[in-house]
Amino acid sequence: MYYINSPLDQFEMNTLLKFVTPFFDMSNLNITTFGLYIIIVLMVIVSLNILTTNNNTIIGSRWNLPLEMIYDTILNTTKGQIGGKLWGLYFPLIYTLFMFILIANLISLIPYSFALTAQIVFVISLSFIIWLGSTITGFNKHGWLFFSLFVPNGTPTPLVPLLVIIESLSYIARAFSLGLRLTCNILAGHLLMVILGGLLLNFININKLTLILGIIPFAMILAILCLEFAIAMIQSYVFATLTASYIKDSLYLH
């Protein structure tokens, strides 16, 4: 049985259920905290969409409003970023990415839960796949002309080699910066909450006076928690927007 002994355990991946046989190595089928929370996030996303669209009514209930607002926001963002006739082709991808990261971020704010988006290997792998997919899309559409993306219009000929190097490094950095930005923000926020929460707990346990005075730092922690909710939503939107921007660059070379 797996027990959580510290808030920092939300960053650790532990095995919850092992599959052991005397004949085959089934360790790849073990259920870990990572796999469990992936399933939870996907179930929440599917449940939300089923519950809000299952009534088949023209005028939705007030419970439909938040999801419809999210849908319209991502729709307009994708249309504004990618534009043209191809934006609708990539909208399901952008919307799914946004919802997945948003739900994962919000679930990670629950005390003692597992922080999916604080797993740097997972998030950077996801951003690398997005970068690689957009690069392949650009090559498939433009062929060798895709490399013109690394030469800004109007660049003086003597500066072309230098700018090609700079633009190439900048483009390659996208594969990691997209995920690193998300992971660092989530990880920093969670660590701050853990540190402040531990200090507050030690402070209020000193005596009765500190127990009363602890209301002030407790209110500050609640304010930081509200800020973490905002960061969770903002980082989800930033990830989705940058993904759409990378796809646009591959499609239109600008």
Curated annotation (Swiss-Prot):
Cellular component terms (Gene Ontology): mitochondrial inner membrane; proton-transporting ATP synthase complex
Cited InterPro entries: ATP_synth_F0_asu, ATP_synth_F0_asu_bact/mt, F0_ATP_A_sf
Top-level division of the source organism's lineage: Eukaryota
Localization, UniProt: Mitochondrion inner membrane
GO molecular function annotations of the record: proton-transporting ATP synthase activity, rotational mechanism
Membrane topology according to the record: Multi-pass membrane protein
Keyword Zinc-finger: no
Main location group: mitochondrion
TM region positions: 31-51, 87-107, 113-133, 146-166, 186-206, 211-231
Keywords annotated in UniProt: ATP synthesis, CF(0), Hydrogen ion transport, Ion transport, Membrane, Mitochondrion, Mitochondrion inner membrane, Transmembrane, Transmembrane helix, Transport
Maturation propeptide residues: 1-5
UniProt xrefs under HAMAP family: ATP_synth_a_bact (MF_01393)
Subunit structure: F-type ATPases have 2 components, CF(1) - the catalytic core - and CF(0) - the membrane proton channel. CF(1) has five subunits: alpha(3), beta(3), gamma(1), delta(1), epsilon(1). CF(0) has three main subunits: a, b and c.
Family membership noted in the UniProt record: Belongs to the ATPase A chain family.
Job of this protein: Mitochondrial membrane ATP synthase (F(1)F(0) ATP synthase or Complex V) produces ATP from ADP in the presence of a proton gradient across the membrane which is generated by electron transport complexes of the respiratory chain. F-type ATPases consist of two structural domains, F(1) - containing the extramembraneous catalytic core and F(0) - containing the membrane proton channel, linked together by a central stalk and a peripheral stalk. During catalysis, ATP synthesis in the catalytic domain of F(1) is coupled via a rotary mechanism of the central stalk subunits to proton translocation.
Name by which UniProt lists this protein: ATP synthase subunit a
